[in-house]
Amino acid sequence: MEALRQRIEAAFEARADITPSTVDANVRSDVQHVINMLDKGEVRVAEKIDGQWHVHQWLKKAVLLSFRIFDNAVIDGAETKYFDKVPLKFAEYDEARFKAEAIRVVPSATVRKGSFIGKNTVLMPSYVNLGAYVDEGTMVDTWATVGSCAQIGKNVHLSGGVGIGGVLEPLQAGPTIIEDNCFIGARSEIVEGVVVEEGSVISMGVYIGQSTRIYDRETGEVHYGRVPAGSVVVSGNLPSACGKYSLYAAIIVKKVDAKTRGKVGINELLRIVD
């Protein structure tokens, strides 16, 4: 794996000279191998080690290189055709493979090759970009978007219209991460490598980026880029120092309790894959 990493790093440094017609066959093979590993979940762009998230930048570089290496090709769709560099994940799936991987994909859901979808995951008409990792038991609801290289944990609910930011454009250092057992409310946007820690509930219409103040009303603390575990977050405002105006902020109103869990708990009837 280390040798592969070094070859990807070297190719990335020379990316300005790479085109689909001039790329070295070995570089093409290496990048395709990484995309295949990401697709199977054998590697992931970020993983939690000893309680801390670590980003494997070389895997992200391989994803970026794929856009330099692979040419556009016609992709067949149910009602139309597409023309893109990245094939669709499920293009060659049959009934047996869907059953073996225990996933449900509702018509018009789009998943690009190079993203991993865990068992017992339900994809409503949504979009999952390449390099993303969607773990087991997660629901990606209607019109939700999982951006490039984003990391979605187990038993997460991404409600309708949710946007989870990617890393490719604009180029971000680290992926957006939603940890296990989180609920992201409708039309909320979590971007720019923000980490929503385990068991948190984000209300409808909350927008969080790296510069967003995340204010804990119980403690007075202000967080940036991280929603502490078990937080219930709503959209709000904080006053300016001069008192003449207020600016948007995400407000931690409380910690998750039994009442909250009752409202956002997973409906097992909707997660039946068999």
Curated annotation (Swiss-Prot):
Entry keyword annotation includes Magnesium: no
Positions annotated to bind substrate: R104, D141
Location in the cell: Cytoplasm
InterPro entries per UniProt: DapD_Trfase_Hexpep_rpt_fam (IPR005664), Hexapep (IPR001451), Hexapep_transf_CS (IPR018357), THP_succinylTrfase_dom1 (IPR023180), THP_succinylTrfase_N_sf (IPR037133), Trimer_LpxA-like_sf (IPR011004)
The entry's keywords: Acyltransferase, Amino-acid biosynthesis, Cytoplasm, Diaminopimelate biosynthesis, Lysine biosynthesis, Repeat, Transferase
GO cellular component terms given for this protein: cytoplasm
Pfam families in the record: Hexapep_2 (PF14602), THDPS_N_2 (PF14805)
GO annotation, biological process: diaminopimelate biosynthetic process; lysine biosynthetic process via diaminopimelate
Pathway: Amino-acid biosynthesis; L-lysine biosynthesis via DAP pathway; LL-2,6-diaminopimelate from (S)-tetrahydrodipicolinate (succinylase route): step 1/3
Sequence similarity: Belongs to the transferase hexapeptide repeat family.
Complex and partners: Homotrimer.
Name of protein: 2,3,4,5-tetrahydropyridine-2,6-dicarboxylate N-succinyltransferase
Gene name, Swiss-Prot/TrEMBL: dapD
